[in-house]
Swiss-Prot record:
Gene: mnmA
Lineage: Bacteria, Pseudomonadati, Pseudomonadota, Gammaproteobacteria, Enterobacterales
Ranges in coiled-coil conformation: none
Name recorded for this polypeptide: tRNA-specific 2-thiouridylase MnmA
Any one GO MF annotation of this record: ATP binding
Organism of origin: Klebsiella pneumoniae (strain 342)
Pfam annotation, one family: tRNA_Me_trans_C
Length: 368
């Protein structure tokens, strides 16, 4: 079967990137259909970008492009495989990244299986800003062409088999080009702002939302010198490097420099803060990562020189990675790095290629 006869199911989110992805695939001659995923049941009535509005936008785009739109409900899978783990991590005092888990369990597992088995798809496609390259019979994950929008950080858990079944049409474009195409086609999503917030749950007041599922446990805020200067409403609401929302100003005798979260003592429910965004207690010389996943290669043995990101949109950090065992590695940065956060992902690169990554188990502090 020629590529042009192959069937692609595009994950239609109701946003501009998936809208333009569907159009580009039609232009390339594929047989294109859309799929809208509903992954969250509860509606709190807030006037945020609701699933109903997104579905209406996705339907309007599909109507305009002349393609069929299917819908599917993955709420049970989302709850069991993403949200419960998300809550467990917060309960343990870590800061998880639900988007990474969501891509792993929903968009490139539940969606991929449903598209292939129920809809007869040869490929799925999404509006992610990444590229793929097929090298020696394996599909590699590459950064998106638009450095500002590159989303490979969120897709490091994909296998080369999953990437081989996936197409990323906007990964070859820059965001302004994508918006321009949508405007020229007069798509309803052309000027729609990019979604933020928790994957599939949307833009909510995070503290209120989390408080519904996890009871808040107020505790002390201590300085690095052990001085008590305030009360926090729950460690889960705070992450390393955080400045806003601490509710503390300068101390009477001290400077007026802003306070930053530098550590969390989960056992004693204490939030530890220091003044200055580059305080030594906030800096790390490396990290230990676990739950490793390598996209298209065997588990690391020995050492590797590469770059790493410990959060999205961070500048690449040159580092040396050493295998501790099959599922744990030690990463040493060339220069100290601020706000390395347990629970987040460390993602590794060689040039344009995303090698894989793991969950940050602990940071190796510059100063303890």
């Amino acid at each position: 079967m020629s590529e042009s006869q192959k069937k692609v199911i595009v994950g239609m989110s109701g946003g501009v990137d998936s809208s333009v992805s569907a159009y580009l695939l039609l232009q390339q001659g594929y047989k294109v259909e859309g799929l809208f995923m509903k992954n969250w049941e509860e509606d709190d009535g807030e006037e945020y970008c609701t699933a109903a509005a997104d579905l209406a936008d996705a339907q309007a785009v599909c109507d305009k492009l002349g393609i069929e739109l299917h819908t599917v409900n993955f709420a049970a899978e989302y709850w069991d495989n993403v949200f419960e783990l998300f809550l467990e991590e917060y309960k343990a005092g870590r800061t998880p990244n639900p988007d990474i888990l969501c891509n792993k369990e929903i968009k490139f597992k539940a969606f991929l299986e449903f598209a292939a088995e129920d809809l007869g798809a040869d490929y799925i496609a999404t509006g992610h800003y990444v590229r793929r390259a097929d090298v020696d019979g394996k599909s590699q994950l590459l950064r998106g062409l638009d450095g500002n929008k590159d989303q490979s950080y969120f897709l490091y858990t994909l296998s080369h088999e999953q990437i081989a079944q996936s197409l990323f049409p906007v990964g070859e474009l820059e965001k302004p080009q994508v918006r321009k195409i949508a405007e020229e086609l007069d798509l309803i999503t052309a000027k729609k702002k990019d979604s933020t917030g928790i994957c599939f749950i949307g833009e909510r007041k995070f503290r209120d939302f989390l408080g519904r599922y996890l009871p808040a446990q107020p505790g002390k805020i201590l300085t690095v010198d052990g001085e008590e200067i305030g009360t926090h409403q729950g460690l889960m609401y705070h992450t390393l490097g955080q400045r806003k929302g601490l509710g503390i100003g300068g101390t009477k005798e001290g400077s007026e420099d802003p306070w930053y979260v530098v550590d969390k003592d989960v056992e004693n429910n204490i939030l530890i803060v220091a003044q200055g965004h580059d305080h030594p207690r906030l800096m790390s010389v490396g990290l230990i990562a676990q739950q490793l996943h390598w996209v298209d290669r065997e588990p690391l043995q020995g050492t590797l020189r590469c770059t790493v990101k410990t959060r999205y949109r961070q500048t690449d950090i040159p580092c040396t990675v050493t295998a501790l065992d099959e599922d744990r590695i030690e990463v040493r940065f060339d220069e100290p790095v601020a706000a390395v956060t347990p629970g987040q992902s460390a993602v590794f690169y060689l040039g344009e290629v995303c090698l894989g990554g793991g969950i940050i188990e602990q940071r190796l502090p510059l100063q303890s």
